[in-house]
Amino acid sequence: MNLTLKTAAGQTYEAYAYTGGKAFDAIKPTLVFIHGVLNDHSVWILQTRYLAHHGFNVLAVDLPGHGRSGGDAPSSVEEASQFIEAMLDAAGVRQASLIGHSWGSLIALESAARLKERITHLALVGTAFPMKVSPALIESSLNEPMKALKMVNVFSRATLAAPPSALGPGTWVYGASMALGRRVLASNSQVNIFYRGFVACDSYANGLEALAAVTCPILFVLGESDQMTPPRAAKSLIDQAKTSGKTYSVVKVAMGHHQMTESPEETLNALKAFLNLQA
């Protein structure tokens, strides 16, 4: 599904959202999935397709300047949240649930804080606050992106020899993620979106204030073996949810940072329970 949006300078561009193989239906509740740094909509394929065939609209976006979306790649969480609002407006969506992974979780959080009652559920997958990125990794993403990509994919996995459970026998989640990173990086010849995304994560400072402003239930999905955003790094957000009297739940899965592909069924089941889906 392509949506026509405008840049800050007033220029139009096409933004892409994967719909799970089902036509968008304004009557159905809408789920918006937001990817992380150097990813695209495809990281959610195992959750979005199921949910699209079980009563939901699915909009798994490519952030601007990533994958199939044009426009300027966002340089901050706040800028990316403006895209989410514009995308909802363009699609004619009055209310939606937001599900974000890693950098996408911060974008979802900031968007939920800004959009208030327009957001009905907020799921933060592989989240942390602050989401600091090591200086070495930021430097490598700028000057040696292939080296940085290998580093990220090593630290993002619970094991490099995981059982082929994601897409069936023969799946190599590490190799697939490396290929995805190369493809997304090559999709933007104007800007190093690897570096820009990491800087956006590292510089975001509004997490606690944003969480306090959220008006909907919150789900945290955390990887027990996550080395990029370990469960302890989400403690400040969870504590803020408790202190602020939010309705929230925490689900831990026995995998690393890419919960959607390393533990797809567990991640889907957590989302189904959160969304009160019984099927």
Region roles according to the model:
Residues M228, M255-L268:
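Catalytic histidine-centered segment of alpha/beta-hydrolase-like enzymes
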Residues G36-N39, S102:
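Active-site glycine-rich loops that stabilize anionic/oxyanionic intermediates
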Residues M1-V32, H53-F56, R94, D239, ...:
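Alpha/beta-hydrolase fold catalytic core
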Residues V214, F220-L222, D226:
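Short beta-strand/loop motif that positions the catalytic acidic residue
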Residues E139-A213:
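Conserved alpha/beta-hydrolase catalytic His-Asp/Glu region
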